[in-house]
Swiss-Prot record:
Name this polypeptide is given: ATP synthase subunit beta
EC number: 7.1.2.2
Annotated compartments: Cell membrane
Gene: atpD
Gene Ontology MF term list: ATP binding; ATP hydrolysis activity; proton-transporting ATP synthase activity, rotational mechanism
Length: 471
């Protein structure tokens, strides 16, 4: 292929000049730059400036580059290793192992990270529920197999812990393959997750791809595509159902904003890139169910300043089948996972998909919680005594439901000292139906905290009564 030379370096942006009589590289083509120390830097063509000069974005640090260095046009986009050999391994955006394990040789199967979304006639039109073992999710915002789910929340409300628990439950409960993509998050968290997953035994069913906070914006913008490409191989070639975790999709948008500014584009609303909707669509449209297999994507979405009207989370909303909203007020009450049962939604919450009994229990739980929410102002001003008997009953049951929506997580057991609970969907429906019917009105409220099925609450109430009797 043709060779060029560096004419300008501005941070992570490298301008490369090619001879005008040679064929210029296409947009998204990978270029290799051999530094003086022998290492190779990969950049990706982003813009044509004219007169044979291409503006490229570096996938690693640009230290050691100088004007005049030769640049090789690879003639293809970045490609990454795929297949069973990726399971249990950790990669960077280029598909290079970063876990100290064996390198992938030239014969390893690879796929380009830039690919078209599946065609309409390849899509699977059926809707199937994915059981997660987490009560609040399975009951009130059921996840669709092959769907896209957003975990919304500000800093420190538990998005990453919830993702870890979902990986744990899907690997243990469904023996499913997962691809975890760390986009622009803390390196410490990525390291902790690697060792936790290795210790719990789920790593052997998971491929991990990291482009963390310390990486250049080009790597953070493309690492989501690297993880998606690995997942697409298992779906399209192996015919498997795959879970794709992206933590954090906001950082994908943020990196795109940085790259857009470096390329000299005029910013759009709130300083975001004008191509925000296009970039998000190109990623999200590849995440879907086909007739061969499915990719179910669970994406943590950081909400800047807890503002859901910010263009980044608002653009993500349009692509989602279900949303799990994490609420800081619930963490202050000690309710984990801090999922807001009224703000979280799912397109699958319909009787023709989940069944009439599940639908009736879920909507009644929401009605009771909504009524409790409406009565809270009266309670705070006038007290419980001013409520009617019926309203007092609703409040008491709503508080039990609110506490019962909490659940101990396996991945958080070292912090909480409690063993994690996986609750089957039928047990979840049965338990909440019993609370709504008033079967457990005599149990103390605190017995419902951090339980699995309702039998745990009954046992906890018995222990509390025994402790009081012994005192």
């Amino acid at each position: 292929m043709s060779a060029g030379k560096i004419v300008q370096v501005i941070g992570p942006v490298v301008d490369v000049e090619f001879p005008l009589n040679d064929e210029l590289p296409d947009i998204n083509t990978a270029l290799n730059i051999k530094k003086d120390d022998g290492s190779v830097l990969v950049t990706e063509v982003a813009l044509e400036l004219g007169d044979g000069v291409m503006r490229t974005i570096a996938m690693d640090g640009t230290d050691g580059l100088r004007r005049g260095l030769e640049v090789e046009n690879t003639g293809a986009s970045i490609s990454v290793p795929v297949g069973d050999d990726t399971l249990g391994r950790v990669f960077n955006v280029l598909g290079d192992p970063i876990d100290g394990g064996a390198e992938f040789g030239p014969d390893a199967e690879r796929m380009p990270i830039h690919r078209d979304a599946p065609k309409y006639d390849e899509l699977n039109p059926t809707t199937e529920i994915l059981e997660t073992g987490i009560k609040v999710i399975d009951l009130l915002e059921p996840y669709v197999r092959g769907g896209k789910i957003g975990l919304f929340g500000g800093a420190g409300v538990g998005k990453t812990v919830l993702i870890q628990e979902l990986i744990h439950n899907i690997a243990q409960g469904h023996n499913g393959i997962s691809v975890f993509t760390g986009v622009g998050e803390r390196t410490r968290e990525g390291n902790d997750m690697y060792w936790e997953m290795k210790g719990s035994g789920v790593l052997k069913q998971t491929a991990m791809v990291y482009g963390q906070m310390n990486e250049p914006p080009g790597a953070r913008m493309r690492v989501a595509l690297t993880g998606l490409t690995i997942a697409e191989y298992f779906r399209d070639v192996k015919g498997q159902d795959v879970l794709l975790f992206i933590d954090n999709i906001f950082r994908f948008t943020q990196a795109g904003s940085e790259v857009s500014a470096l390329l000299g584009r005029i910013p759009s609303a709130v300083g975001y890139q004008p191509t925000l909707a296009t970039e998000m669509g190109q990623l999200q449209e590849r995440i879907t169910s086909t007739k061969k297999g499915s990719i179910t994507s669970i994406q943590a979405v950081y909400v800047p300043a807890d503002d859901y009207t910010d263009p980044a989370p608002a653009t993500t909303f349009a692509h989602l089948d279900a949303t799990t909203n994490l609420e800081r007020a619930l963490t202050q009450q000690g309710i984990y996972p801090a999922v807001d049962p009224l703000a979280s939604t799912s397109t699958a919450l319909a009787p023709e998909i989940i069944g009439q009994e599940h639908y009736d229990v879920a909507t009644e739980v929401q009605r009771v919680l909504q009524r409790y929410h409406e009565l809270q102002d009266i309670i705070s001003i006038l007290g419980m005594d001013e409520l009617s008997d019926e309203e007092q009953t609703i409040v008491q049951r709503a508080r039990r439901i609110q506490f019962f929506l909490s659940q101990p997580f396996s991945v958080a057991s070292q912090f909480t000292g409690m063993d994690g609970k996986y609750v089957k969907l039928e047990d979840t429906i049965r338990s909440f139906k019993g609370i709504l019917d008033g079967k457990y009105d005599d149990l103390p409220e605190d017995a419902f905290r951090n339980c699995g099925a309702i039998e745990d609450a009954v046992e906890k109430a018995k222990q509390m009564n025994d402790a009081v009797a012994n005192n």
